[in-house]
Amino acid sequence: MNSTHHHGMYTSLHLWNRSSYGLHGNASESLGKGHPDGGCYEQLFVSPEVFVTLGVISLLENILVIVAIAKNKNLHSPMYFFICSLAVADMLVSVSNGSETIVITLLNSTDTDAQSFTVNIDNVIDSVICSSLLASICSLLSIAVDRYFTIFYALQYHNIMTVRRVGIIISCIWAACTVSGVLFIIYSDSSAVIICLISMFFTMLVLMASLYVHMFLMARLHIKRIAVLPGTGTIRQGTNMKGAITLTILIGVFVVCWAPFFLHLLFYISCPQNPYCVCFMSHFNLYLILIMCNAVIDPLIYALRSQELRKTFKEIICFYPLGGICELSSRY
């Protein structure tokens, strides 16, 4: 998917010159065709080391999230299980991008006989990236639905969202997204695939917006109703609203990091020859960096918004001989 040294997903989707594969110069030539002055039309170069570094950071951070949720029984709740699914998706997107950079860099030094093998490897990695993107969208939507149930069906929530049902939902999400991701790459010759991806992204945004408008408009009313009941209803609802706010932040970061990529696809479909659209598309590598940054930022959001998760992070880190870090973290 990284087009610094190859066209990645766009080779599969035929967004760049179909006859060229693997070199940054070819990408620039494809974009700059008909624009001899180059400039904005030249493909923005990003060092492969940047992709690899972000991939490694994302891998370590998201593994920490997954291990923390598995380790701490207090985090064995539907919301955190969905967060775990989101962490896996983020990790796969970022690591696949970094891995693809390494593979293509190595294969570019070989002769043309390895080109077909390069394409096959690239298609496999792109399938993983596409599947993980769909899983990210579905995981975010699942977290939103979970927050909706905690706020509006607080008394019946534990009967509705059981661990078994959550496991089935997550399994179905990944099974469906894996099949869809593979099919999207196999049939990527058709523009309908790109339109489908764009439609799914914007449909998700509309669903999220609708859910949140209803959720936050009615939240105060339900908090007042729960408050009159015996027990700690107010505290519970406050916690639920905190979870909803956390999800709002996650969705905001997701939109900021992924929107340029989908705008890129939209411009390719709607105005591939327009100078402004071509100029926007020439920054494709920057949009890939933003996507990888999403996978790096999400674990930081989890840590900042959840004291329990923060505490578990410290316990895991302190398990290793990192006394200096533990001593520093104990002050906060």
From Swiss-Prot:
Homodimer; disulfide-linked, also forms higher order oligomers. Interacts with GNAS. Interacts with ATRNL1. Interacts with MGRN1; this interaction competes with GNAS-binding and thus inhibits agonist-induced cAMP production. Interacts with MRAP and MRAP2; these associated factors increase ligand-sensitivity and generation of cAMP. PANTHER family: G-PROTEIN COUPLED RECEPTOR (PTHR22750). GO terms for cellular component: plasma membrane. A lipid is attached at C318 (S-palmitoyl cysteine). Ca(2+) binds at E100, D122, D126. This is Melanocortin receptor 4. It is found in: Cell membrane. Coiled coil: none annotated.
